[in-house]
Amino acid sequence: MTTHYIAGQWLAGQGEALQSLNPVTQAVVWTGQGADAGQVEAAVQAARQAFPGWASLSLEARIGVLEAFAGKLKARAEELAHCIGEETGKPLWESATEVTSMVNKVAISVQSYRERTGEKSGPLADATAVLRHKPHGVVAVFGPYNFPGHLPNGHIVPALLAGNCVVFKPSELTPKVAELTVQCWVEAGLPAGVLNLVQGARETGVALAANPGIDGLFFTGSSRTGNLLHQQFAGRPDKILALEMGGNNPLVVDEVKDLDAAVYTIIQSAFISAGQRCTCARRLLVPQGAWGDSLIQRLVDVSRSISVGAFDQQPAPFMGSVISLQAARALLAAQAELLGKGAVALLEMTQPQADAALLTPGIIDVTAVAGRPDEEFFGPLLQVIRYADFDAAIEEANNTQYGLAAGLLSDSNARYQHFWLRSRAGIVNWNKQLTGAASSAPFGGVGASGNHRASAYYAADYCAYPVASLETASLALPATLTPGVTL
């Protein structure tokens, strides 16, 4: 069994037994054993040994390997999309867009590296001032399950481009996607040890995060795990830690002319990927009164007809499943708890089949709920809050420990400027879905959503550190000596 990729070799695991399941059928997709602490150590050592050679390659040589990787992804795009769909439950049309994002990440990362962490020089008195960047060394990448190809890729590609070597621990829920991705790297000619794959759950993650041989850790996932990592790295300024976590994201709706456009944008913000994007709208702020009532009624009517089904269902569904039966049950429990506290079900989220992680969209009015939990419910559950005036809406939007994404649907530019100025979030959109992102922009948040290490286009910033140099080819005395020195 070839579960892990360490020092250029596919190896069986020596840790706990693992398997991934299709969330709808519960069929076994992948089986193996996780990496124990010894195998994690071997992976870190392999990366350390490979680092000098990889870092000393020219930038163009590293780009060549990355471009070959993009080519391998294209060649196996259909296989990879099927694997993503099978393991996560997301529809094939959406899985295919994820593979496209993986391919495009290479060119975007090269552009970002040249722009943000390239080399610059200029004259300074009798020397040349030069700014260059160096890789950190060996970095760990922890991947999430919701975009098991694209999101780890967003750390791995810029890290390798900068000259780092990587130990990659994917989510234990999506090991097969990680295995296929690493196969593409191997086929692209990446030297042994430059990228190492260690599969596993908590045991593997704890061993990797605590390994003294890593120079940094790049994480995308839940705030709970991210906070634990932040505590673990406290007092270690020698290690770079990049955290991209979740959010309790608000979408504020003003009285717009095009009601259906608002409804469609809300659905794309709240229910795409079965609500499993970190930028999904969790709270919908709607004005009190007749217009708000009509918006909510239209939203409920359209959401009730949203197609939900298996990843390969035809015609294709809009929503697939959530990642697991456990996740589905936790979401239903969260809905029940809110309803028990006084929330009103406008469209109750349901689980049509007890043995499948398929959930229908849920919309609940929590306006009357005292002490609403400031949590990220990672699924198709949208909370509606009615507001009396625009300033109250902004205050409620900011009433969260998180700060990932916020959005406004409004026909007024003045209101958007006011909203943008007062919003506390790393992503602020106007009349666009919260789940949309530009490849040429950073991606990250403030507060409990991250530690100011924005990813995407700004990933280059945490993959290398700046080195400032004053240089001249010959050593010579200055024209004027410092007072008090005689030669």
UniProtKB/Swiss-Prot annotation:
Pfam families: Aldedh. NAD(+) binds at G221, S222, S223, R224, T225, G226. It catalyses: N-succinyl-L-glutamate 5-semialdehyde + NAD(+) + H2O = N-succinyl-L-glutamate + NADH + 2 H(+). The active site is at E244, C278. GO terms for molecular function: succinylglutamate-semialdehyde dehydrogenase activity. Its EC number is 1.2.1.71. It is an enzyme of class 1 (oxidoreductase). InterPro entries: Ald_DH/histidinol_DH (IPR016161), Ald_DH_C (IPR016163), Ald_DH_CS_CYS (IPR016160), Ald_DH_CS_GLU (IPR029510), Ald_DH_N (IPR016162), Aldehyde_DH_dom (IPR015590), SuccinylGlu_semiald_DH_AstD (IPR017649). Pathway: Amino-acid degradation; L-arginine degradation via AST pathway; L-glutamate and succinate from L-arginine: step 4/5. Keywords: Arginine metabolism, NAD, Oxidoreductase. It comes from the Bacteria. Belongs to the aldehyde dehydrogenase family. AstD subfamily. NCBIfam families: arg_catab_astD, PRK09457.1. PANTHER family: ALDEHYDE DEHYDROGENASE-RELATED (PTHR11699). Catalyzes the NAD-dependent reduction of succinylglutamate semialdehyde into succinylglutamate. This is N-succinylglutamate 5-semialdehyde dehydrogenase. It comes from Pseudomonas entomophila (strain L48). The lineage of its organism: Bacteria, Pseudomonadati, Pseudomonadota, Gammaproteobacteria, Pseudomonadales.
